[in-house]
């Protein structure tokens, strides 16, 4: 008797299932890369010294490049967070750190911004947390 019940339920389930399912949607792919060569420095017309294509009638941010600020202040990867810090503790941490008040465009400019904000030092830190910079080093182009 149990066999007949199970067979009836199975047969009913087979009849209740639809026979034609819609096909899956086609896969989406990323667009192909451009077939032309991109110009250097983002716009091809800048000269990187602030006197080129920026500010006033230009096409950049004052240095002829894209909005990267001209040069890399901090190395890519772990030490990529620019900070202005007051005190270094054994080379492991820096105290009283904050993001620079203006965007620096090179190492000496980064130092002058930090000095103007209370005599702080320009640093590149791994993990800035609540005014504490963990594992910091000097930025590119500074001593």
Swiss-Prot record:
Reported induction: Expression is induced by carbon starvation.
Domain of life: Eukaryota
Sequence repeat segments: 41-42, 43-44, 47-48, 49-50, 51-52, 53-54, 55-56, 59-60, 61-62, 63-64
Signal sequence interval, chain numbering: 1-17
Record-annotated disulphide pairs: 74-124, 85-97, 125-136
Pro residues compositional bias, start-end: 20-37
A GO CC annotation given for this chain: extracellular region
Biological role stated in the UniProt entry: Aerial growth, conidiation, and dispersal of filamentous fungi in the environment rely upon a capability of their secreting small amphipathic proteins called hydrophobins (HPBs) with low sequence identity. Class I can self-assemble into an outermost layer of rodlet bundles on aerial cell surfaces, conferring cellular hydrophobicity that supports fungal growth, development and dispersal; whereas Class II form highly ordered films at water-air interfaces through intermolecular interactions but contribute nothing to the rodlet structure.
The family this protein is said to belong to: Belongs to the cerato-ulmin hydrophobin family.
Record's subunit section: Homotetramer. Further self-assembles to form highly ordered films at water-air interfaces through intermolecular interactions.
Record-given protein name: Class II hydrophobin qid3
UniProt gene name: qid3
């Amino acid at each position: 008797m149990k066999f007949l019940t199970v067979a009836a339920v199975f047969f009913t389930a087979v009849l209740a299932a639809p026979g034609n399912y819609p096909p899956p949607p086609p896969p989406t792919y990323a667009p192909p890369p451009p077939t032309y060569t991109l110009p250097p420095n983002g716009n091809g017309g800048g000269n990187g010294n602030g006197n080129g294509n920026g500010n006033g009638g230009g096409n950049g941010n004052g240095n002829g490049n894209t909005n990267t600020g001209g040069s890399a202040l901090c190395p890519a990867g772990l030490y990529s967070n620019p900070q202005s810090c007051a005190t270094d503790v054994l080379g492991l941490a820096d105290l009283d750190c904050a993001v620079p008040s203006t965007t620096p465009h090179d190492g000496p400019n980064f130092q002058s911004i930090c000095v103007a904000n209370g005599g702080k030092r320009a640093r590149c830190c791994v993990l800035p947390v609540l005014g504490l910079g963990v594992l910091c080093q000097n930025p590119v182009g500074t001593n």
